[in-house]
Amino acid sequence: MIEYFTFKHRGESESFRDEVYLTLVPHVTVAVFYGSVMRTQTKVSPEMFSGLLAEVSSDADFNRMCSVLDDKLPGNAEYLVLRIEGSSIACFRHGGVMAKIVINGDLKMLPNGIFGLNDGDKILVATENFYSSLTDEGILADALVSDTCAEWMNLMVRRISDINQLKCGNLSAVTLLVR
């Protein structure tokens, strides 16, 4: 079973340009789109990203799904897609969205590829802006003292708020816990 918690915050920005996409059937698919960082004419709306992902997320082949996203999105689009099936996780990262995983008391960045999962593993998927006010030590400490995804997210958001009162632009993140 996968427990999850999502966080989306506009900050002082005029609009929310990021997107957090989550489906549970037929596979757990999580995607975070960093639309607020796109400053060129080839902007992709969060709705366009979600629509495209909805079309391809049911594809049984994760690599084919990622190839379609890579082909249809502009080169400067920043996003990360995770798919969890059974005891494995597939990760495809493009740009400033990262996934960090807590395994056996250690925090590691999740690179592109397919990896095994165990009960108790915790995963944070977030935009670069979300990570900018956090340290790896803080993320790990919050993960280790949290029993739920919501509690872990709340502790990290509190750390960000203590630094900038959440006036830092769009913040987008998802926490996942393997049970």
Report the location of each language-model feature.
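N-terminal entry segment of metal-dependent catalytic domains or homologous docking segments
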Residues: 1-54, 88, 92, 97-116
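Catalytic core of PPM/PP2C metal-dependent serine/threonine phosphatase domains
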Residues: 53-102, 160-178
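Charge-dense, low-complexity intrinsically disordered segments
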Residues: 39, 56, 60, 143, ...
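Short amphipathic alpha-helical segments
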Residues: 41-48, 61-65, 148-152, 156
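C-terminal catalytic subdomain
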Residues: 69, 118-124, 129-179
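Structural motif
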Residues: 3, 28-30, 35, 80, 84, 90, 126-127, ...
